[in-house]
Amino acid sequence: MKKLSALILIATAMVTFTGCKNSSQTANPLLETWNTPFGVPPFDRIKAEHFKPAIEEGIRQHNAQIDSIVSNTEIPSFANVIEALDRSGQTLTNAYTTFSLLNAAESNAQMQELDMELSPMISAHFDNIYLNDRLFNKVKAVYDQRDQITDPQQKRLTELIYDRFVRAGALLTPEQKNELKQVNEQLSTLGVQFSNNLMADNNAFTLVIDNPNDLKGLPTSIQTAANTEALNRKKEGVWIFTLSKPSLIPFLTYADNRELREKMYKAYLERCSHGDSSDNSKIINQIVKLRLDKAKLLGYPSYAALALDEEMAKTPENAYALLDQLWQPSLELAKKELEEMKAIKKAETGDDSFESWDWWYYAEKVRKQKYDLNEEELRPYLSLSNVLQGIFQLSNRLWGITFRPVSVPVYHPECVAYEVLDKDNSHLGILYFDFYPRPGKQGGAWCGTYRDAHYENGKRVAPGVTIVANVSRPATKNGVALLNLDEAETLFHEFGHALHSLFSQVKYTGLAGVEQDFVELPSQIMENWAFEPAMLRMYAKHYQNGAPMPEDLIEKIRRSSLFNQGFTTTELLAASLSDLDIHTITEYQPIDLNRFEKQMLNEKRGLMPQIEPRYRYPYFSHIFGGGYAAGYYSYIWAEVLDKDAYQAFVESGDIFDRPTAESYRKNILERGARYGALQKIPWPRTRYQTVDGRSWIDRGGDRLHRCASCASRYGCTQCLDPSHYRRDRHHCKIGLLRPSPYGKFQ
């Protein structure tokens, strides 16, 4: 996931690190020049108490810069209005970006209280900027003369900034602006409350097992990890499982004790919906109402209409069109998978009744039966070190870039950092990794930046990028972290986001972003390499003796790539539809979230009760605590793009083809928002203007289509004829996304 900074409200703010000359503030590292290697944040000196005064000082400085732009008596120009805006807010961006990154990865009660205080402060500050009539008049004056701007990036930035002002309410009446300010302030606070509640509920639950019989079925490595978790909590003689994915998913997959699987899954499923202080139901209702109020103030019938107006999809109807065309084929395949699992369950127990907490357990039995593959036998070849080196080797083969470990300040002892060097050995940026789950860290995985690439005085200012994950810890204190397939693929995914930031070649920070439904293309295209046989031969080595992964295991991975894809796709589509459903409401009435979800998914669309949406509303942090509101469909949308783009590598005859990689880098990864995604760019492999879900399903070369050899509509899972494969990829590969059910996110 691409982590959206809270400063997305003003993408024109520059993230360079300049010193404050106020002597009374010099003890605050956030207000000093960062004389650290590569200008990284001095994490070793930053304390929670530094943030509020630094942000208050940043707001004061930013206001002074805005006043200077407004009071300038010269004729409004790109330089004295648009560029000045893009360069403004440096101190504030410095402080608040650092705060946001730390609050997601290394939070505590003090940081959460600060977030509640700072979020409405930041919201009010940017409202005061965007709703400043005198400032907007200057922006509009430059915008009205934009055809006279000859530099393409300057013209594009002018258009983007004008659009941001309009979408922020610059054309509203004074009364409407005051109402909008109140709405934005409330929304900023509610989003923080939602996230804090979710973190509290995630941390509150533990399953403590004191009877070894209850561990039956669990691999030794999982048992050892649970025992280590207990010892870390000062508890001996027990095993502790938590709701973090490296603990939850293996338990659901392997534990023979059905009652305990049910207990674990219900604890996950019912987060933030117990009617206590962490219940998010009222918060979600308030958010939905306020978002609708905001949309109507700005002239839109629904919040989804407002949100999608600036995206590739343009309208909720277009997003629905893709999801709806994929829904029935995915659901039909999931039903087929269910029947296979029910048959196994009946053969073993005499009972084919099936619940949602049975899916992982019996799906694993299907995988073992059909493909003779146990994911635990893959872990020794997927050590964290090997996977990371594989990603680095792939990047070197595609673009010639290299990664050098560096010693820089970090916010947690487990973090590591690398300098990224281009093929000419020039500095591209700094890349942090934070791999493991811990209390105070949000679940899932994401990529963020504390500094976006831009140019200053003709010189590129390199970005600072961070990848945060929650992969399996080493089972013992001095052990090696051994990943499963999903965790390995997650790192490839987030690394794709990192490359998007590291390769950026835009002059202005306001051009650093792209459309929400385009942003997942760089991440999802990287997933395609993760388990290519040629790629596995490069990095999948046994952690103890360095032996390469046996060819029969590589073949099993390839053959089992069809495994469980009906489920995976259906629960992803269900979450995407839930997001759109609640944000296309045009008249608000109090919502019973559970009832609304069942009506829209189970009753209207036929979702079977054994499958829950990937995220239910009370813990759907992407849309209520993050930047994906009415935008979760973007993962499916970008999947359409990524399969077409990756096919360019396949058709070259070499998935490591350097010319194709350089073209992809130049035309996609470097360009930022220099063009809108719907504008023509010189990269022919992104069919974002002609997305047709049904034809995509039936078309060869994409994820869901009819097998040319056996005519199976949804993939030849039975025949497995070797002739049905080409270039190490299955002809009728099924599944919109390969990640396992809970994928990459919280």
Where are each of the predicted segments found?
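Short His/Asp/Glu-rich catalytic/ion-coordination signatures at enzyme active sites or charged loops
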Residues: 35-50, 99-118, 140-182, 242-282, ...
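Active-site-proximal, well-structured secondary-structure segments within enzyme catalytic domains
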Residues: 157, 189, 196, 200-242, ...
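C-terminal motif of bacterial Sec signal peptides marking the signal peptidase cleavage site
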Residues: 16-19
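Short pre-active-site segment immediately N-terminal to the catalytic Zn-binding motif
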Residues: 472-491
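C-terminal, non-catalytic "cap/extension" segments appended to globular domains
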Residues: 23-50, 57, 238, 369, ...
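N-terminal helix-rich structural modules
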Residues: 25-219, 649, 710
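Positively charged n-region of N-terminal signal peptides that target proteins for export
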Residues: 1-4
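Intrinsic-disorder-associated, low-complexity terminal segments enriched in Asp/Asn/His/Tyr and depleted
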Residues: 702, 721-731
